Structures are given as C-alpha cells and as structure tokens.
Amino acid sequence: MDKFRVQGPTTLQGEVTISGAKNAALPILFAALLAEEPVEIQNVPKLKDVDTSMKLLSQLGAKVERNGSVHIDASQVNVFCAPYDLVKTMRASIWALGPLVARFGQGQVSLPGGCTIGARPVDLHITGLEQLGATIKLEEGYVKASVDGRLKGAHIVMDKVSVGATVTIMCAATLAEGTTIIENAAREPEIVDTANFLVALGAKISGQGTDRITIEGVEHLGGGIYRVLPDRIETGTFLVAAAISRGKIICRNAQPDTLDAVLAKLRDAGADIEVGEDWISLDMHGKRPKAVNVRTAPHPAFPTDMQAQFTLLNLVAEGTGFITETVFENRFMHVPELSRMGARAEIESNTVICHGVETLSGAQVMATDLRASASLVLAGCIAEGTTVVDRIYHIDRGYERIEDKLRALGAHIERVKGE
C-alpha cells in the first residue's frame, strides 16, 4: 500500500485550484441512469470513487467516457444489478438503486462498503423507496427493489436527516407518478447540486436547499450538460492547512457561500479571510491560531467532514478547544494517531478536549478514514521531522492529487509506492 512521507515543518502559502465536489459528483453520476439521452458532466474530480462509479455504470450497460468531462449515455442500460466486487469499496453505490427501480422497475445493489465511520445503514433508503411503492427484499447480501409499472408519489417524512437517503428518494421520485414531498430533507449544497442536475434534464423539483423538497414526477428525462459545484470540504481542508502553518493561501474555483460555518470558525481562530465570487483567501500574518469550540451538525451547521481538520487546528492552537461530533459515532480515530505526534487530547463521549501544543513531532501514523487521513497529512506538514502516513488509499478516495497541491504550497511530501 502507498504511503506519504512528509518532512516538516513548513509554512504553506500560495494558490490552489479546488476540484469538483466528490459528494455531488457521485450522486450526479448515478442520477444519470435516469436519463434516456446522453449527458455531459463537467468538473468531475479524478478520484478512486469516481472511477469505481464509472465502472459500475459501464457494467450496467451505460456508455461512459472521460475526456475532460464525463460523458454518459444510459439509453442502452440492460443490467440491473450492482455486483459486490465493485460495491464493496464504496457505499455510494446504493445510489444506483433508486434510478434503476424508477426507470426500469427493478434494481439490485450489494450491501455497500466505504469508510468505517459508525452506523451508516441503508434502512432510510429502503423505507423511502417502499413509501414510493417499491417492493424491497434483502437476499444473499443484496438489496433488491422492484415495482409493477411506475413508482407512485408520496408524502415522506424522514426519521432523521440523511444526505444519502434524500438523494435516493429525490432521484426515484423524478420518474414517479404524481407528486412527492420529502420532509426533514437534507439541505447540503451537494443535494442542491444533484437536484439542479436533474432539473437540467427535465425534472420538476423545488425546495432543494430547504428541509422540504417537492418533486413532481415526469415520464422521462432527457440529456444535458452540467457542471459539478466546487468541493467545499477540499476548500476547507486547504484553508486549515494554511491556518495551522501560519501561512496564507488563495483557493480558486471555490464557492464561498457553501462554507459559512467553516469560515466563521476560521475567523474566530484569528484568520484574516476575504471572499470573492469564486475564490477565498486566508492570511494568518504569521500568527498561531486560537482554539475554537466546534459542534458538528447537518448543513447549514458545521460539517462533520471538517471535524478532523479542526481537531488538528485546536491541537496546535493557543488555548483549549472542544470539538463535539453529533453526526457520526466512532469518528475520532485520528486523535490517538495525532497523540503519537505529541498532541494533547482527551476523548469524553462524543467530545474531544484539545489542549493546544506549540509543536508536533514527526511519527509513523496510520490513516483510518478519508478526512482523518487528510488531517494526519496536514499534521506532517507542520510537525518537526519526518511523518509517514500509512494506508493513504483513504485519501485517494476523496482528494484529487493532494500531494501535488500541497507541494505547490511549499510542502515537502512524497508518495512512497507500496510493496
């Protein structure tokens, strides 16, 4: 397995171009199964999960090409089963189920894999599809969905806010008979982006970005061209990289209005931040950040996917900061690894108490999930000496060329090929 070797400490400064959002690109790729005509999707990041999704769409019979943009023609889809060998590495594959059953009346997806963060069950996806009239069976490790004729619109109240299940229900409802209302819907920018993509193909969706989404079913969706929004988590990660190294950065191709909660906390930490239409700049003026208190919650509150990065910020900041995780359990796996580098932290239930230290020391550490591993790489950039981050396949699932982008900011980082 590949590793990163990082030599520190460095002050990170310069410009970085933000990639398209993984968490919008994946649902949009699967939503393309609903279209009877070709679609072109621009600004799709080059990531392992994206490659896996494209492979899966090809196996289902779609024509998939990448030349800058991703081109998908799902008019000839004739296989309705997403097999275990592709699904096992990526839980996003569950998003194939809604479009398959909505357009073809049947779909099967192997129970998914991906990051091992707490309980992320597929029951909310299943309940939603059942409420739209699908029959669901769990057999031999597969979720099997079927319907006679078309799905039927329904008034669905989500038990809890779920990005994944909101996507599944919204996609399936676009081709259902009648109107579907999703109450307690997720409000994330990536949900809005997926809805806007579907609208570009002819879907009738309103209320995306609020907790009540209305979908009027149509008989079919056509083709179109759509550009995926910038990745707010990648943007936030690079802003934190500059903040903890007391540097300055400009993030290009960013979307500042998707990051309000993160920018507010960075300002609290002492960062000087400016925003334009598609850029964000951060300057620490050489100062050490101040500790901040953070509580994760669904959008528009502070995103759980930025929690590990802010844990690291607090661990090198002035003072003591509290980080409370309310979205996923078991999401502090980076804390013991950072402690190996000299960080001082205690975990109490779903809160990390971070006591800022002046410097971290390089160590051998292991990535456990996507965002935790990014925080370990950033820690290596500011630690004294050499840090080796193992199991970086997690990072490759969510960050496009992170080492090249960090190197352009002055980091001393190299990828060491595994045996």
UniProtKB/Swiss-Prot annotation:
Documented EC number(s): 2.5.1.7
Alphabetical GO biological process terms: cell division; cell wall organization; peptidoglycan biosynthetic process; regulation of cell shape; UDP-N-acetylgalactosamine biosynthetic process
Signal peptide as annotated in the record: none
Cellular-component GO terms for this entry: cytoplasm
SUPFAM superfamilies the UniProt entry points to: EPT/RTPC-like
Keywords: Cell cycle, Cell division, Cell shape, Cell wall biogenesis/degradation, Cytoplasm, Peptidoglycan synthesis, Pyruvate, Transferase
UniProt-annotated binding residues for phosphoenolpyruvate: 22-23
Catalysed reaction, written as an equation: phosphoenolpyruvate + UDP-N-acetyl-alpha-D-glucosamine = UDP-N-acetyl-3-O-(1-carboxyvinyl)-alpha-D-glucosamine + phosphate
Catalytic residue list: 115 (proton donor)
Catalytic class of the enzyme: transferase
Domain of life of the native organism: Bacteria
GO MF: UDP-N-acetylglucosamine 1-carboxyvinyltransferase activity
Main location as per UniProt: cytoplasm
Positions bearing 2-(S-cysteinyl)pyruvic acid O-phosphothioketal: 115
Pathway membership: Cell wall biogenesis; peptidoglycan biosynthesis
UniProt-annotated location(s): Cytoplasm
Binding site for UDP-N-acetyl-alpha-D-glucosamine: 91, 120-124, 160-163, 305, 327
Function as written in the Swiss-Prot or TrEMBL entry: Cell wall formation. Adds enolpyruvyl to UDP-N-acetylglucosamine.
Family designation: Belongs to the EPSP synthase family. MurA subfamily.
Protein name, as recorded: UDP-N-acetylglucosamine 1-carboxyvinyltransferase
Species per Swiss-Prot/TrEMBL record: Salmonella arizonae (strain ATCC BAA-731 / CDC346-86 / RSK2980)
GN (gene name): murA
